[in-house]
Amino acid sequence: MSLFSPHRILLRTGSAFQLATATRALLSTSSQLRNTKNAQSGLAEQARAEEPVASSPSQTTRPEQKSLEEETTKQTQTHADSTVNEWGARLTDLNINARLPRSVQALYLRPLRRKAEYGLPVCDLQLRSYSVRNLEFFADFAIRAAYYLNLPVSGPVPLPKIVERWTFPRSSFVHKKSQENFERITVRRLIQIKDGNSQAVQAWLAFLRKHAFYGVGMKANIWEHESIEIAKTMDQTLPEIEKALEPHISQFGRREDAEPAHDLITNFLGSERLSLSKGPLTDVRGG
């Protein structure tokens, strides 16, 4: 009896055959990979060999490209210079041959003023605001308006600031002991009109009230110069004043069916409310 059965021999030979086929497949794949690597390396070497040949024409065209770029930059610079020169020529032509209106030019200049002949004050206008910018703007506007009304102006003169402070509790309950401070600063300017007609001054103040600027308050003190016969002039103007006040005074008065005023007063004084006998400590003690 042999040690190895034919069945076992067939199994062993079958496994050996399987191993042989696997090794052959591995060898074939490794050979294919080597061939692809060799092909890639060959292509890379060909590309490297062809690089100097392809770069030679680019080297020859670089100076031409530089010259073209320089020409384009020169053209753009000349075009920009020409446009600047054109606009400069236009502006100089406008400044020489044309001018802006006087009202527009005055915005960029100091306000014009009239000279006072006698220097008698007629009106003191005080401007107040919490913003210096708004105050300066409206003061400049008032001075320009006075010039066109032929009113001599002096100012604006800065007056002392009004500083007000308040202290309040921050809130109730938890923050009751902590306090909060508030401060308000009022800025003032004084504009004085001299040697002006009273009607012109009234027109100036009405114009300022009509075109008042936000955040700016006004207070005016006006002086009017009258002659010695002021009583006669007041008597002459009295009927006109009565006519002007008649619609306002007609709203006040007493009813026709009401009791006379004398009777009302006597009844009130004779009432029990004012009697002294009913009051405490009114009786005199007998000695």
From Swiss-Prot:
Record's compositionally biased regions (Basic and acidic residues): 63-73
GO CC entries: mitochondrion; small ribosomal subunit
UniProtKB keywords: Mitochondrion, Ribonucleoprotein, Ribosomal protein, Transit peptide
Biased composition annotated in UniProt, kind: Polar residues: 33-43, 74-84
GO terms of molecular function: structural constituent of ribosome
Transit peptide: 1-33
Sequence segments annotated as region (Disordered): 33-84
Cellular localization per UniProt: Mitochondrion
Cell wall biogenesis/degradation as UniProt keyword: no
Any Pfam family the entry gives: Ribosomal_S10
Xref: InterPro entries: Ribosomal_uS10, Ribosomal_uS10_dom, Ribosomal_uS10_dom_sf
GO BP field: translation
Family to which the UniProt record says this protein belongs: Belongs to the universal ribosomal protein uS10 family.
Subunit structure: Part of the mitochondrial small ribosomal subunit.
HAMAP family in alphabetical order: Ribosomal_uS10
Function: Involved in mitochondrial genome encoded proteins translation. Involved in the binding of tRNA to the ribosomes.
Protein name (database record): Small ribosomal subunit protein uS10m
